[in-house]
Amino acid sequence: MSFFHAGKIRVMLIGGEGREHAIVWSLSKSPKVDLIICAPGNGGTARGSTKIKNCDPDIKATDLTGLLGVAETHRVDLVVPCSDSSIISGAVDFFETRGFRVFGPSKKVAKIEGSKRWAKAFMERHKIPTASYQSFSSPSEASLFLQSQPTSRHVVKASGLAAGKGVFLCNTKEEAEDAVNKFMVERVFGEAGEEIVIEEFLVGRELSVTIITDGKVWRLFPVGQDAQRIYDGNLGPNTGGMGVCIPSDFFNVEEILEIQQTILEPTIRGLEDESKVTPYSFLSITALTNSRS
């Protein structure tokens, strides 16, 4: 089901966070866009243009049936799931099978974001460089592993979605044990922490590489650096992202080409091979250059 309105299109964005506001702001400037529906949107998305309309503030990004009703009511031409939870729940597949044009990854491909354990195993299968790791579903086994390691510094991650907050950079074994306890005993992130990944602690320059792809052809956006820590000066715990500097001048062409050949291309090929469908419309990868343990 798709409608066109005098050569202009109507877009529905699923989600209500900062990224939705940024996308809405950009779409509202296009003469090709007639109406933007934010489901549910937020205070920022509701301001700045007569093209933008928030829908029911109580609707959830995972309520696909309810969102379908919104899309049909407003006769939208394009659906853009922005919320991680909506993507993981299969919003792209859901709307595509009902005749809508959708920008985003299928549910199969979204596993690379929804499960860090699966993502790490995927990288191993396709020989994509990644930090060494172990995954655990038992806090006692995770603790025994930490105590057996010769190094003190580790990265402890919730395997599931935790709104960008499920990564702890631990400088001591005590900090790592505390992270395990938060995830698996206190369950501060609920089901997201039922399984965890413990990685080696790598140090280097971090960059964010973003592409648009249909699974065969891809285009690279300018490379940036994501500010993930909550406080100024790169301090405090990780968040879903406080901002990003684009373009970044800290990386050279040779480094970008290496990332393209060793990470981007194998990832796209691997996702296509394993999903057996057009795997992605959008892919963002964080890489570490000149890394060391």
What name fits each language-model region?
Residues I14-G15, P81-C82, V156-S159, E199, ...:
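Short beta-strand segments
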Residues E17, H21, A61-T65, T73, ...:
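Electropositive phosphate-/nucleotide-binding environments in soluble metabolic enzymes
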Residues G7-I9, K32-D34, R75-V76, R98-G99, ...:
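Short coil/turn connectors at secondary-structure junctions
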Residues M1-K107:
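ATP-binding N-terminal substructure of ATP-dependent carboxylate-amine bond-forming enzymes
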Residues C170-S293:
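Internal nucleotide-binding/catalytic subdomain
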Residues A61-S137, E141-S148, V155, L161-A162:
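Conserved N-proximal alpha/beta basic substrate-recognition cap immediately N-terminal to
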Residues R153-K173:
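Conserved anion/nucleotide-ligand pocket segment
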